[in-house]
Curated annotation (Swiss-Prot):
Its main location: membrane. One of its GO terms (molecular function) is UDP-N-acetylmuramoyl-L-alanyl-D-glutamyl-meso-2,6-diaminopimelyl-D-alanyl-D-alanine:undecaprenyl-phosphate transferase activity. Belongs to the glycosyltransferase 4 family. MraY subfamily. Pathway: Cell wall biogenesis; peptidoglycan biosynthesis. One of its GO terms (biological process) is regulation of cell shape. Its EC number is 2.7.8.13. Pfam families: Glycos_transf_4, MraY_sig1. It is found in: Cell inner membrane. This is Phospho-N-acetylmuramoyl-pentapeptide-transferase.
Length: 360
């Protein structure tokens, strides 16, 4: 919205030309989202406590988690509010890529909200029935997939970018829709599975969003896109502002979610953030880099798949408990050690993924 206003005012006040610069708006986006989260946090936590909207803890989980019972959840509301207000203020709202990410973010946030609400009201860990959760996740993802395919058909926006091979960029055709669906739904659920310890999911999300901010900027800049041998997609550059909003809101939420957490994001936050990251990866054509950057999310998800598969096929468990962060807790690692080590791994994976952009 501000960019529209600046276009009008810059003819009278040259200062407003600053708002045309993507880097300036990205910085303001981080500051705005961070400020909103820090301001909103205490109020939301107090409101959730008054409503007795507390975390439901599994009885078969680590004993150290029993003390978390009753800690306010649904803190993802502050994240989504901060991101939404910030994007509305600083992003170019004529850019369809911005709306695609926001549609998934808020749509998945709504699904997560219903899931959290059912968990809190019924005081169990079941939440929204699985088939309905996947139905709404799938519906939202498919709407975006079909819309993006129709908009960018047979252009760089629907090519498959393969790491390490600068000349391998095949057109996906209708397979683009299927890939987009799996990336969005898969990333959403992967982040959701990772959100099991204080601050465990939010920092990798921040790291990945920061990585995608750079990739979006490079993809939208014709010189850098050619230099890195990646598709040039002009609309992608505005996603820098969206990624910056995720970073700012994430840091603001971490202020209250760091160990010992005052609030949990709940499914309203984790499903939404995962869906947004998946959508951004699709829009900048870096689905493979998402697998690398989001390696923590991938490993958490694989640990659940392997655990369930092994138990059904062999009657034996591979890990003491899945997702894998619980395995390390049951091995005796203090929760902060698990969290910080996963953060370090996540940061390194993002740096490795960015390095692959030049290794072609």
């Amino acid at each position: 919205m501000i960019i529209w206003l600046s276009n009008f005012l810059e003819q009278y006040f040259p200062f407003f030309r600053l708002f045309e610069y993507l880097s300036f708006r990205a910085i303001l986006s981080i500051i705005t989202a961070l400020t909103i989260s820090l301001w909103m946090g205490p109020k939301l936590i107090a409101w959730l406590q008054n409503l007795q909207i507390g975390q439901v803890v599994r009885d078969d989980g680590p004993e150290s988690h029993f003390s978390k019972r009753g800690t306010p959840t649904m803190g993802g509301i502050m994240i989504l509010t901060a991101i939404s207000v910030t994007v509305f203020l600083w992003a170019d709202l004529t850019n369809p890529y911005v709306w695609a990410v926001m549609f998934v973010l808020l749509g998945y946030g709504a699904v997560g909200f219903v899931d959290d609400y059912r968990k809190v009201v019924r005081k169990n860990t079941d939440g929204l029935i699985a088939r309905w959760k996947y139905f709404w996740q799938s519906s939202i993802a498919l709407v975006v997939a079909f819309a993006l395919y129709a908009y960018g058909k047979d252009t760089a926006a629907t090519q498959l970018v393969v790491p390490f091979f600068k000349e391998v960029m095949p057109q996906l055709g209708l397979a683009y829709i299927l890939l987009t669906y799996f990336v969005i739904v898969g990333t959403s659920n992967a982040v959701n599975l990772t959100d099991g310890l204080d601050g465990l999911a939010i920092m990798p999300t921040v790291f990945v969003a920061a990585g995608f901010a750079f990739i979006a900027w490079a993809t939208g800049n014709v010189q850098f896109a050619n230099y890195l041998h990646i598709p040039h997609i002009p609309l992608a550059s505005e996603l820098v502002v969206v990624c910056a909003a995720i970073v700012g809101a994430g840091f603001g939420f971490l202020w209250f979610n760091t160990y010992p957490a005052q609030v949990f994001m709940g499914d309203v936050g984790s499903l939404a953030l995962g869906g947004a990251l998946g959508t951004i990866a699709v829009l900048v054509r870096q689905e493979f880099l998402l697998v690398i950057m989001g390696g923590v999310f991938v490993v958490e998800t694989l640990s659940v798949i392997l655990q369930v598969g092994s138990y059904k096929l062999r009657g034996q468990r591979i890990f003491r408990m899945a997702p894998i962060h619980h395995h390390y807790e049951l091995k005796g690692w203090p929760e902060p050690r698990v969290i910080v080590r996963f953060w370090i791994i996540s940061m390194l994976l993002v740096l490795i993924a960015l390095a692959t952009l030049k290794v072609r």
